[in-house]
A protein has these predicted regions:
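Local sequence-structure signature of Cys/Sec-based thiol-disulfide redox active-site neighborhoods
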Residues: 1-26
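A short, hydrophobic beta-strand/beta-hairpin element that forms part of a small beta-sheet core
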Residues: 54-63
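N-terminal, polar/charged subdomain of small-to-medium soluble alpha/beta proteins
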Residues: 68-73
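Short helix-capping segments at alpha-helix termini
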Residues: 28-32
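Thiol-based oxidoreductase modules, predominantly thioredoxin-like and allied folds used
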Residues: 33-44
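Short, flexible active-site loop motifs that bind/organize anionic cofactors or intermediates
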Residues: 7, 36, 64
Length: 82
């Protein structure tokens, strides 16, 4: 079975990015999923689309939340991935 993957759009020296990632990692104890971290500044098309919202948590190309971890939205999304 393929593990679900969530993507965190991040950038260097971003304290909100670090906080969102740390909070998200706590969910890996309850849900089995991978976290992919992508630096938006290395991908011009991502920076153009998402740069003002970083950090952004995505499921595929669908936004779950940005700036801060939205606990309710993450719980709902991860519950559907089971």
């Amino acid at each position: 079975m393929i593990r679900p993957r969530l993507t965190v759009l991040s950038r260097a020296y971003c304290h909100l990015c670090e906080e969102l990632l740390a909070a998200l990692k706590q969910y890996q104890g309850r849900y089995d999923f991978e976290i992919e971290v992508v630096d938006v500044d290395r991908h011009p098309h991502l920076e153009e689309k998402w740069g003002d919202k970083v950090p952004v948590l995505l499921d595929g190309d669908r936004e779950i939340c940005h700036y801060f971890l939205d606990v309710a939205a993450v719980d709902a999304r991860l519950a559907r991935m089971r």
